[in-house]
């Protein structure tokens, strides 16, 4: 080891130095502080620039206001200012205001756009078939009405004609077809389209597509049409683009006297269209009614619940007839609207009535059922002292003596526990089977369509077990079930005090209305005094029925009851026929007889203990089911009950008809 010498090429050994944790932390902290100072400085500079820009904007605004004050424009009211804000743009240097309108028609979709805003779009399957109509205000361009008329179905063209005739002159009309709109487009409707200036509308063919824009009483602004090349196909989609020049606000407004009624009218007519003379500038129809008071009115303080949805034109017609009925109390009327729709509430406000909207619950018939429950509950909450409620629907005409009819009969509900309701509707009361407006019946079915409900019945029996939202049941069919009716009956008139005019609804269409509702008899005679009202009580009615059967002439049962000659050509007589009815629910012969009499035949209605009462050839006609009816004892031994066998069902035919 003495001769060892270090190599000069090797680095001398030294202990490795390590920075302490304190110095590392201090170094990082210094860097973070520097970054934070940089960010703070940037933020201050940004705020400074923002303040400078805002100060400049404020100074520019003050300068502009000062210049405007030196040369002020005439003062304008709020409505004019609003109209200015909403008015469409000017085209280039031209002072004329115009709208860009696009209209699309095809097999599965229609849409309308105004200045780039879609105001109609319908591409739902199996819905929206027919002619869609939109009405625009000619001064502002805002949508005043949207309707669809299924002119493939009967009578929808009549509804379209009525609507278009009620639109004020000058309004902008837009029409477009989805799927098919010509099958039931009859000559009257085609003539009206021709009068609007349309060339393609009157010639509209099977599955053609068509788009139209025009001014009522003015020029056509655009039209496109594509013919279907074959019965199995549709016309090509058409897209119509056109400019719509707008007129001055002066042309679009009426100048009525400044009264509370006219203020209501002005608010209504500035928003919606299709209501005819109520918005006439020269001679508007009244919106306040003064029917004669009803002496000793027993229903003056009975609340009236109007069950409504989104059918404002129906609601308008219904409320006009209701408010014209003798003995009406407008303060007792509440309109319940299923959904937050604007136009039905506008109709309610026009007449100065109370309207209540609520959120829809469930779907289809369950939604209607929940709407009824909510409305009935709210009615008795609004009027906690009421013992009864009158229940109406938005698609009913109300007879002039509707409240008189109820006033004369409502005591029966208080005095006879065997009664379920009083209804203004006779299911079998057609023009050829109803005759006597003073005559009343007891029936085992609940007709609805304008009826009186006892509060105790609703609160104690119906409300607690009302069908829940998940049950897709019709509320009226549920009320007719034996579990609810419990053997009780309803009082009805021979001649109805309500008329079901609606042809659009959940369980309604033009075909169904034509077959079962259009020819119902409706009383138009005021001041009818009902006859022998107290004879409608349970025991007294049995005495009356036995009296009628004892006096009735037995018809010749060898004749065909469907032939006109089955009843003699007399007037004022009472006749009786006996039909086979083996048990209480055996309605085979009755159903066939109802079919050939052209009255309600989808289910059994209007019967009392196996007996039906109606008129034929102005004769009182009684039909007794043997042996099920207790009145079978009145059948002479020599008479064989009539049996009518139903025709055999065609293969593939539906098992049951839809019922309302």
Curated annotation (Swiss-Prot):
Protein name per its UniProtKB record: Protein O-linked-mannose beta-1,2-N-acetylglucosaminyltransferase 1
The keyword Signal is assigned to this record: no
Region feature (Catalytic): 300-646
Sequence positions bearing Phosphoserine: 7
UniProt domain GG-type lectin: residue ranges: 97-258
Enzyme Commission identifier(s): 2.4.1.-
Location within or outside the cell: Golgi apparatus membrane
GO molecular function ontology, one term from the record: acetylglucosaminyltransferase activity
Function field: Participates in O-mannosyl glycosylation by catalyzing the addition of N-acetylglucosamine to O-linked mannose on glycoproteins. Catalyzes the synthesis of the GlcNAc(beta1-2)Man(alpha1-)O-Ser/Thr moiety on alpha-dystroglycan and other O-mannosylated proteins, providing the necessary basis for the addition of further carbohydrate moieties. Is specific for alpha linked terminal mannose.
Necessary cofactors: Mn(2+)
Annotated residues for binding of a carbohydrate: 129, 179, 207
Disulfide bonds: 254-281, 269-279, 421-490, 562-596
Region of interest (Interaction with O-glycosylated substrate glycoprotein), residue spans: 473-481, 506-512, 600-605
Binding-site list for UDP-N-acetyl-alpha-D-glucosamine: 307-311, 338, 371, 394-395, 506-507
């Amino acid at each position: 080891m003495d001769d060892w010498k270090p190599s000069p090429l090797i680095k001398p050994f030294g202990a490795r130095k390590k920075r302490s944790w304190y110095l590392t932390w201090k170094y990082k902290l210094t860097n973070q502080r520097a970054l934070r100072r940089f960010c703070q400085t940037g933020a201050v500079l940004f705020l400074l620039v923002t303040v400078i820009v805002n100060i400049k904007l404020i100074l520019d605004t003050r300068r502009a206001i000062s210049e405007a004050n030196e040369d002020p424009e005439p003062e304008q009211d709020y409505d004019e200012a609003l109209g200015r804000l909403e008015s469409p743009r000017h085209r280039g240097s031209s002072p004329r205001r115009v709208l860009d309108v696009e209209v699309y028609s095809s097999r599965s979709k229609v849409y309308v756009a105004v200045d780039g805003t879609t105001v109609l779009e319908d591409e739902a399957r199996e819905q929206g078939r027919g002619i869609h109509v939109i009405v625009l205000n000619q001064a502002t361009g805002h949508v005043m009405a949207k309707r669809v008329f299924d002119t493939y179905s009967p009578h929808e063209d009549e509804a379209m004609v009525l609507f278009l005739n009620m639109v004020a002159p000058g309004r902008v009309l837009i029409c477009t077809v989805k799927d098919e709109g010509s099958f039931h487009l009859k000559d009257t409707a085609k003539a009206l389209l021709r009068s609007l200036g349309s060339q393609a509308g009157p010639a509209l063919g099977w599955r053609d597509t068509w788009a139209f824009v025009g001014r009522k009483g003015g020029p056509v602004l655009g039209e496109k049409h594509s013919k279907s090349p074959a019965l199995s196909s549709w016309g090509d989609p058409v897209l119509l683009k056109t400019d719509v020049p707008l007129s001055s606000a002066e042309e679009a407004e009426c100048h009525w006297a400044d009264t509370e009624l006219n203020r209501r009218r002005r608010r209504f007519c500035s928003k919606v269209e299709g209501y005819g003379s109520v918005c006439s500038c020269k001679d508007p129809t009244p919106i306040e009614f003064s029917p004669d008071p009803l002496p000793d009115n027993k229903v003056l303080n009975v609340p009236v619940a109007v069950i409504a949805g989104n059918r404002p034109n129906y609601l308008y017609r219904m409320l006009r007839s209701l408010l014209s009925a003798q003995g009406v109390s407008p303060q007792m009327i509440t309109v319940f609207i299923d959904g937050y729709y604007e136009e039905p509430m506008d109709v309610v406000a026009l007449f100065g009535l109370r309207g209540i909207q609520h959120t829809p619950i469930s779907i289809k018939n369950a939604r209607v059922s929940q709407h009824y429950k909510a409305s009935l509950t709210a009615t008795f909450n609004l009027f906690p002292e009421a013992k009864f409620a009158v229940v109406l629907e938005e698609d009913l005409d109300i007879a002039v003596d509707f409240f008189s009819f109820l006033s004369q009969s409502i005591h029966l509900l208080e005095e006879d526990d065997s009664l379920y309701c009083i209804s203004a509707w006779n299911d079998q009361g057609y023009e050829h089977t109803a005759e006597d407006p003073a005559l009343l019946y007891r029936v085992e079915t609940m007709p609805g369509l304008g009826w009186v409900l006892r509060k105790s019945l609703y609160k104690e029996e119906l409300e607690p077990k009302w069908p829940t939202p998940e049950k897709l049941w019709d509320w009226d069919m549920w009320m007719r079930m034996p579990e609810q009716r419990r053997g009780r009956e309803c009082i009805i008139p021979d001649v109805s005090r309500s008329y079901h005019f609606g042809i659009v609804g959940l369980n309604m269409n033009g075909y169904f209305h034509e077959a079962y509702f259009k020819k119902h008899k409706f009383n138009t005679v005021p001041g009818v005094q009902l006859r022998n009202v107290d004879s409608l009580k349970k025991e007294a009615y049995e005495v009356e029925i036995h009296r009628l059967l004892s006096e009735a002439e037995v018809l010749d049962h060898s004749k065909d009851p469907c032939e006109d000659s089955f009843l003699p050509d007399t007037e004022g007589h009472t006749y009786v026929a006996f039909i086979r009815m083996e048990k209480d629910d055996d309605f085979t012969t009755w159903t066939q007889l109802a079919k050939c009499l052209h009255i309600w035949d989808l289910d059994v209605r209007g019967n009392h203990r196996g007996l039906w009462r109606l008129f034929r050839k102005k004769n009182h006609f009684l039909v007794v089911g043997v042996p099920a009816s207790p009145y079978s004892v009145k059948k002479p031994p020599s008479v064989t009950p009539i049996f009518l066998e139903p025709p055999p069902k065609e293969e593939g035919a539906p098992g049951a008809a839809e019922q309302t």
